[in-house]
Amino acid sequence: MTHLPVVSGFEMVKILTRFGWTPKIQTGSQYIMKKQGSTFRIVIPQHRELRPGIIHQIMKEADLSIEQITKYL
């Protein structure tokens, strides 16, 4: 199993953009990402390093694996 990478909020936004998510709103220190044809949205904090729990939650919401994340780093 691959280890969870250290990812910043901005890097996570770039990764999700490659999978069809687009940043719709930036409020305060958070990006709100949306995918076309979906009412679901993902909130990504603008931190230097996202905690492992936040990364796991974003991966679960976006239906991504660790391998898909590390491929685009």
Put a short name on every predicted segment.
Residues M1-L73:
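Basic nucleic-acid-binding interfaces
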